[in-house]
Amino acid sequence: MKSIGRLLKSVVQWFDSDYGSDDLATARDRADKVDPGRCAAFLFLHACCLGVLWVGWSWTAVWSAVFLYFVRMFAITGFYHRYFSHRTFSTSRPMQFVLALWGAACVQRGALWWAYTHRHHHKHSDEAEDKHSPVVDGFWWSHIGWITSKKNFPTDYKQIPDLAKYPELVFLNRFDTLVPIIFATGLFLTG
C-alpha cells in the first residue's frame, strides 16, 4: 500500500511541484541519487527527436528548431540567470511574469526553483553543500544527475523572499510542467 501511495505522490508531483514538499529538511536528508521516474521522462523527451526518422523533416521545422533554440537559451541566460538569480536589471511586474513564462518554456523548471538553486550554488560553490559542483561530484552529476535527484526537487521559498512574494511566479514555479506541455502541444498542432 505504501508503494502505491509513493507512486501516486510521484505522479501528482509531475504536475504540482510543491505537493508534499512541506518538509524541506526531509528532502535535504535524502540520498543524492537519480530518481528513475524523472529520468524516464527526460530520456523519453530526448528519444522523441528520433521521430524525425519516421515523419521526415522540412526547412520550416529546421529553422523553427534553430530559432527556438536561441530564443530559449536567451531566456535561460538572460532571464532565469541574470534577472531571477542575480537581479542584474529591473523590470515591471507584468514583464517579470512574461520573462518567467518565457523561461518556463525551456523545461528547466520554474524561475523560483532556478533562482533558489543558483543562489544556493553561489553561496556554497564547490563545497559539499553545492548541488551541482563538478569538483565535488564530477561532470555527469554536475550537468545532469543533480536535476533528476529527489533531494534537489523542492524549492526553498524562504531563501528567495524577493521572488516568492509574487503569487503569479509561485504558480508558474509550482506547476512548472504546464507551460512546456502547452508550448509543445502548440508546436505540434501548428505542424
Language model segments and positions:
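Non-catalytic, topology-defining segments of multipass membrane proteins
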Residues: M1-G191
